[in-house]
């Protein structure tokens, strides 16, 4: 029977320009129909960012910075998000030209992503376990077929359905008093491929690490319609 949701853990590696690849731990909750929580933690500096969809909308939470932004967004409907297994399945369904090969108990799909115009990453290779029919890994490539994002699924549990109360954003912020800043942007494309949220006409231009009360914090600077 169809479950009411899932929980999964994965690792994600992003290969940027010339630097070292960045490694992240990813944890996803999904409860049908529309509750999502994605937690992404950078392994080197332990900075965590969350994107949460609940009844009130879509929120991006950076617990350590005590910041929560609310978006007007259809996320994740419009996006290929490789760590959301429902979206991954949708990618495969929508790409009529997807090619499947079979090898060593695995199905390997070569398929298009659905938001290449925004990301510049048009294709992906999805490896599915033949027995469980669950994805084992996803590699997302640029137009030169160079690997840019690699996701390895460590554990996928289809029997977990978190209660909707568990998706309350207040739970994830380190300070109960926090106010939610509304990012009043009609957001066409909320992407959570860390380093951060990128929305229309806004891009991450700077990332500073500052020492504050002995704590290391990452300050993200945006440029665009809204500057924070």
How would you label these PLM feature ranges?
Residues 27, 175-228:
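Short, solvent-exposed recognition patches
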Residues 2-5, 29-36, 52-57, 104, ...:
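Short, solvent-exposed coil/turn segments at beta-strand boundaries
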Residues 102-174:
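Gly/Pro-enriched, hydrophobic low-complexity segments
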Residues 27, 48-50, 97-99, 123-127, ...:
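Short, surface-exposed charged micro-motifs
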Residues 54-122, 162, 176-193:
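Flexible, processing/modification-adjacent segments and terminal tails
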Residues 27-82, 142-152:
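An acidic-aromatic
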Residues 10-13, 37-41, 108-116, 138-141, ...:
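Short beta-strand segments that buttress and anchor functional surface loops
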Residues 1-35, 45, 93-102, 178-184, ...:
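N-terminal leader/targeting segments and the immediate start of mature chains
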């Amino acid at each position: 029977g169809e479950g009411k949701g899932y929980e999964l853990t994965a690792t994600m590696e992003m290969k940027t320009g010339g630097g070292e690849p960045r490694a992240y731990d990813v944890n996803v909750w999904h409860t049908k129909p529309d509750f999502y929580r994605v937690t992404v933690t950078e392994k080197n500096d332990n900075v965590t960012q969350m994107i949460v969809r609940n009844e009130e909308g879509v929120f991006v939470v950076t617990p350590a910075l005590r910041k929560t932004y609310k978006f007007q967004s259809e996320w994740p409907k419009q996006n290929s998000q490789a760590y959301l297994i429902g979206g991954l399945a949708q990618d495969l369904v929508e790409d009529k030209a997807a090619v499947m090969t079979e090898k060593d108990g695995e199905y390997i799909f070569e398929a298009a992503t659905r938001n290449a115009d925004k990301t510049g990453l048009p294709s992906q290779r999805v490896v599915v376990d033949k027995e469980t029919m669950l994805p084992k890994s996803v590699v997302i490539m640029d137009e030169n077929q160079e690997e840019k994002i690699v996701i390895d699924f460590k554990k996928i549990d289809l029997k977990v359905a978190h209660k909707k109360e568990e998706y309350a954003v207040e739970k994830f912020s380190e300070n109960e008093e926090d106010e939610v800043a509304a990012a009043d942007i009609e957001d066409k494309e909320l992407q959570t491929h860390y380093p951060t949220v990128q929305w229309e006409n806004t891009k991450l231009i700077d990332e500073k690490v500052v020492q504050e009360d002995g704590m290391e914090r990452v300050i993200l600077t945006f440029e665009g319609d809204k500057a924070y």
